[in-house]
Amino acid sequence: MDMSKKKSKRASPIESSQEEIAISTSKTATTEKPKKTKTTTKKKASQPSQEVVMETESEVEITTTTTSTSTTNNNNITTTSTSSQQSNGTLSSSSSPTIQSIPTTPISKYIPSLSQIGTPLSPNRAAQRLREKDELSLIHNRLKSALKKLESAETELEKKNQEYEELDQKHTATIKQLKQRSDQVEKQLIEEQNQNSDLTSNRNILENELKSKESVWKKEKDEILLKFQESINKLNQENSLAQSQLKSEIVSKEYEIDGLKSEINRLKDDLQYRIREGEEKSRKLLENEYNRFKGKEEEYNQLIVSKDEEIKKYKFELKEKEKSSNAMNKKENELNNLIQAHERQIEDMRDSINREWELKAAQMMEEHHARTIHLQQAVDSFNEEKERIKSQMETLNGQIEDINIKNNEYEDRIKEMNVLLSQKDNSIGELGVEIEESKKKMRKQMADLKSKDGQIALLQIEINTKDNKCNTLQTETNRLKSELYSITNQIDPEIPLDPEINSLKELVKGFEKTVDDRKRKRSKLQHEFNAAANQDQNGMTIEEQSSTSTTTTTSATGSSSSTSHLDNIDSSKLPTGPEQSELFNPDTVSFSLVDSNQEFIKLSVHGDMDNGLSISKWRLIVVKPDGSKSGFSFPDGIQPFKGIKSVTVWTGRPRPQGTPTENEFYWARTELWTSPVEGTIVKLVSPSEETTTVTLPADGIYQKPSSAGKSNCLIM
């Protein structure tokens, strides 16, 4: 409606200009009529007519047209005068008079001399009319040019209106599309916000899970540290007890040595006194006895010096132990003070003995003849005491060697535990660093991302990486648990094993029962086969057939019967193995093979068919040519072996992870077989301290000879 109104308003100036042209033509026609033809119009009392003002972009400007009516007194003629104002030298507007009477040209208004002309038919009037025609023709030409300009402007306006309408339609369409797009974008934003909230909740859940796992790891680490600390405290207590016992024994032995020294000095005084007062023969005898006792005194002095050196050695060892444990400082200081006090007492006793010797020299010589027999008895008892002391010293040295071996084992285990702790600390530190880096990366990515699609993709990638890390952490925990389990299997039997081993034993109890039944059947068949082999070769085949027939008839139905039958046949058809090649000696353990090149020790265990033989608490000791020793003890809980079994001890390597091992043990001590190997002694010690010894040759391989039979076996 607005566009139609605009078009009507814009078309009105053209119509007014056409009406004006028609009026001007009619006016020229009326001027050629006689004078008396008059144009009459209805009178209107000063009613101004206003024209529609039109605006154009280039040439048309605002114009105001005023129409005035003037009436003459004689003929009542209404005259209209138009005045137009033009700015900037262009036609700005056109007049549209109210068509009520035929207008006349108001020339007399501008030329006052024309108003005095008498009649219209005068020649001045005709000239005036001619001028008016010229003016009208000029006005017509101007109006035509103005009309052309108006038409061109109107066409341009119509074009612009059409363009405006097209643009308006396009804008409305684009606005609708933008509104639809904005609605879609708002929906997408809502969906993405929901997805983002879900992802953030998932991320928080994952972070909580990681925190819980970290707390579990920390708890496990604290438990392991407590266990290690308890084991270390136990080892320190055992070491302190052993050292205190040794020190007490050393003090007692020193006291006995001091008593013997005092007795020797007393005897020396007797001899010297009798030598002075007696005859020459007795003097010679006493001199010989004196020299002999002097040699013994020197020996005892050497023993004292060696004991002093041992005391110094113990002091040095105590000082070294003082660096490793703070709890031993007070005890070591007390022991050092006791040793110094004893040394002072020894010196005081020596001084007092020397004084007493000077005082009692005369008295002792008088009693010499009476005590010669007693002296001989004392010498004999002294020799016996000497032998007893030597045996005690040997036992003490053996105990010290065992303690050193145990200390080496404990040090190896402590080193392994420290390595495991460092590995766990490193893994926990790396995980913490990775978590912090992932958090930083996630923050940067959340800040740098501009589109929600990219955020979702990155969050999914982060979740996948966290899942992978969780999986890797779980595998790492399983691996560390298996390593701890393998380490606990190698711990000294005096230290109690973890409860996990008992639970694992309960889990595999059913499997062990089936395995024991199968081994029992096989061992019976082997025993029967060995007995038959000693009698006759033909009897062996008959025994095999009978044993296989009995096992097939008495075995269970299904797959278990077929497998046991096959196992029995296989065991009966292998007479050349290491278990069948030697005679069966129940309740014995012997060396079968010692190979220093491939680093393993193979033992042959002969267990009773009823109760079996367990090698728990048995020990292996390797003595190098330079005197250094290393020991390995079999752990508790080893099932008894029935029949002839081969047990292998691998040295210098840890227990393999994820692979079951049967009758195999692992001694993690490294550099056990370093050159030179020749002369290395390998000892097998039973719980009752019975020892079997093997010496390695130059090639480092010892193999039990086939004819030896029982030469290296330890009979229980």
UniProtKB/Swiss-Prot annotation:
Coiled coil residues, start to end: 130-450
Domain of life: Eukaryota
Subcellular location: Nucleus lamina; Nucleus envelope; Nucleus inner membrane
GO terms, molecular function: structural constituent of chromatin
Compositional bias of kind Low complexity: 62-107, 546-564
Organism: Dictyostelium discoideum
Region of interest (Disordered), residue spans: 1-107, 519-584
Keyword list, A-Z: Coiled coil, Intermediate filament, Membrane, Nucleus
GO aspect biological process, one term: chromatin organization
Annotated family: Belongs to the intermediate filament family.
Domain LTD intervals: 575-698
Protein name, UniProt field: Lamin-like protein
Motif, Nuclear localization signal: chain positions: 519-522
GO CC term, one of those recorded: nuclear inner membrane
Disruption phenotype: Nuclei are misshapen and disorganized, with irregularly condensed chromatin and centrosomal detachment from nuclei.
Annotated IF rod domain residues: 132-515
Annotated signal peptide: none
PANTHER family, A to Z: LAMIN TAIL DOMAIN-CONTAINING PROTEIN 2
Quaternary state and interactors: Homodimer. Lamin dimers then assemble into dimeric head-to-tail polymers. Ultimately, two head-to-tail polymers assemble laterally into a protofilament with a uniformly shaped rod of 3.5 nm in diameter.
SUPFAM superfamilies xref list: Lamin A/C globular tail domain (SSF74853)
Keyword Translocase listed: no
Sequence ranges of Basic residues compositional bias: 1-10, 35-45
Motif (CAAX motif): 713-716
Residue ranges with Polar residues bias: 532-545, 565-584
InterPro entries listed in its UniProt record: IF_rod_dom, Lamin_tail_dom, Lamin_tail_dom_sf, Lamin_tail_domain
Function according to Swiss-Prot or TrEMBL: Lamins are intermediate filament proteins that assemble into a filamentous meshwork, and which constitute the major components of the nuclear lamina, a fibrous layer on the nucleoplasmic side of the inner nuclear membrane. Lamins provide a framework for the nuclear envelope, bridging the nuclear envelope and chromatin, thereby playing an important role in nuclear assembly, chromatin organization, nuclear membrane and telomere dynamics.
